[in-house]
Amino acid sequence: MHRVQNVQSHVGEYAPDILVVGSCFLDYVGYVDHMPQVGETMHSESFHKGFGGKGANQAVAAGRLGAKVAMVSMVGTDGDGSDYIKELERNGVHTAYMLRTGKSSTGLAMILVDTKSSNNEIVICPNATNYFTPELLRAQTSNYEKILHTGLKYLICQNEIPLPTTLDTIKEAHSRGVYTVFNSAPAPKPAEVEQIKPFLPYVSLFCPNEVEAALITGMKVTDTESAFRAIKALQQLGVRDVVITLGAAGFALSENGAEPVHVTGKHVKAVDTTGAGDCFVGSMVYFMSRGRNLLEACKRANECAAISVTRKGTQLSYPHPSELPAGVT
């Protein structure tokens, strides 16, 4: 059974500036002192269950900062799905167009975090997300009329739901004059790369990391200069604006074909890097929605992501406005 979830706590018409179409997963996180070897059974130092999924992470990052943001995703009709919708609302994310299915449970991610390096390993089980098809989304939203409304400024998509749904939504939003943001994580498979390339002209802002940029362009991204070359190659494929995130090394970007620039990362003692890239993307679009240009939005998003890696957890680590350094507004 598929149905649109109508949340009663939102009264009257809601007109978000930002719409996120993506994934909602439950995170099962274990903290270990080293990553297990093949055949090794080990104890975790601690464990927690949280809320994740790249789409929801980005929506929550924006919502916590005060954005007018709405989420469209597919969760189960199970208790986890109900809990997730409530959690989104608690973080300022509008949920009236969330979809639910009785055909599968809510998706989940199994995450190991190395407490010494802060690196992680993640295994995803999409579950309900597999039913999030473009045909279903069109049917439940009156061919997008309910979600791509007049006045919507930004659409954010990732690569964690069925790719046809992502690409169909991006193309439709672009045709309606919406600024489309595509974060190509997790890294696309070779067949997905070939599907993505023809859709890049419909992407206003493409935001890959260095691995994803290399997969799309065929160019290795190992330093600032190679990142600049990849940016130019992506713009030749039809993208207007490009941001390549470089982990602790910061990011490189070009807005509207201008010469690329590099901004170094902020050095902090990282505890858990899970979801830091999502924090960056959601925060970046929030600051853009407040009138910042791409460079200034990314600088501020860099501050938000730097805060997030100093804390355990994914969405729980994302900052509220009161936690930001002076001048980061």
Swiss-Prot record:
Activated by a monovalent cation that binds near, but not in, the active site. The most likely occupant of the site in vivo is potassium. Ion binding induces a conformational change that may alter substrate affinity. The active site is at 278 (proton acceptor). It comes from the Eukaryota. K(+) binds at residues 272, 274, 308, 311, 313, 317. GO terms for biological process: D-ribose catabolic process; D-ribose metabolic process. Pathway: Carbohydrate metabolism; D-ribose degradation; D-ribose 5-phosphate from beta-D-ribopyranose: step 2/2. Requires a divalent cation, most likely magnesium in vivo, as an electrophilic catalyst to aid phosphoryl group transfer. It is the chelate of the metal and the nucleotide that is the actual substrate. It is found in: Cytoplasm; Nucleus. GO terms for molecular function: ATP binding; metal ion binding; ribokinase activity. Its EC number is 2.7.1.15. Gene3D superfamilies: 3.40.1190.20. Its cofactor is Mg(2+). It catalyses: D-ribose + ATP = D-ribose 5-phosphate + ADP + H(+). ATP binds at residues 209, 245-250, 277-278, 302. Keywords: ATP-binding, Carbohydrate metabolism, Cytoplasm, Kinase, Magnesium, Metal-binding, Nucleotide-binding, Nucleus, Potassium, Transferase. Substrate binds at residues 25-27, 53-57, 160, 278. Its main location: cytoplasm. One of its GO terms (cellular component) is nucleus. Homodimer. Catalyzes the phosphorylation of ribose at O-5 in a reaction requiring ATP and magnesium. The resulting D-ribose-5-phosphate can then be used either for sythesis of nucleotides, histidine, and tryptophan, or as a component of the pentose phosphate pathway. Specifically phosphorylates D-ribose. Fails to phosphorylate 4, 5 or 6 D-carbon sugars (erythrose, threose, xylulose, arabinose, fructose and glucose). Belongs to the carbohydrate kinase PfkB family. Ribokinase subfamily. This is Ribokinase. It comes from Leishmania major.
